[in-house]
Regions:
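Core segments of cupin and vicinal oxygen chelate
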Residues: 11-50
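Vicinal oxygen chelate
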Residues: 2, 84, 88-119
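Short acidic/glycine-enriched loop/turn segments that link adjacent beta-strands
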Residues: 37-39, 69, 99-102
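A short, acidic/glycine-rich surface segment
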Residues: 57-63
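Mid-chain, well-packed structural core segment of small domains
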Residues: 66-87
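N-terminal beta-strand motif that seeds the catalytic metal site of vicinal oxygen chelate
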Residues: 1-18, 71-75
Length: 119
């Protein structure tokens, strides 16, 4: 077997409207059409996609001291300071990467961990 590309990450959410605000407005991802019947939303990030899937009983882990060591989605950002300010403006907590590199972690409204890294 040869894996040739990464296609998408599926993220469980409990409130689609709230999550669409986070991924579409706060993170600025481009929403794309989807033809599936179950509730959700798809976002395009370059050649990659983020699939929000509604799962009303999705478990969350709010222990932010270990965000970087938990499963997470990482996005590259052009300016980390602007990204941090945007998250804070929308009242999302941030945690600097313990590695010392230019990156922060936050959580979406359902507790899914998001890394923003300046490349």
């Amino acid at each position: 077997m040869q894996i040739t590309n990464s296609l998408h990450t599926a993220i469980l959410v409990t409130d689609l409207q709230r999550s669409e605000h986070f991924y579409g407005t706060v993170l600025g991802l481009a929403k794309i059409d989807r033809s599936l019947k179950y509730p959700g939303a798809w976002y395009q990030v370059g050649n990659y996609q983020i699939h929000l899937i509604v799962a009303p009983s999705s478990p969350t882990d709010n222990q932010n001291e270990k965000w970087g060591r938990n499963p997470h989605v990482a996005f590259a950002v052009a300016d980390l300071e602007i990204a941090k300010q945007e998250l804070l403006n929308h009242n999302y907590p941030i945690q600097a990467s313990a590695s010392g590199r230019p990156a922060v972690f936050t959580q979406d409204p359902d507790g899914n961990i998001i890394e923003l890294s300046q490349q």
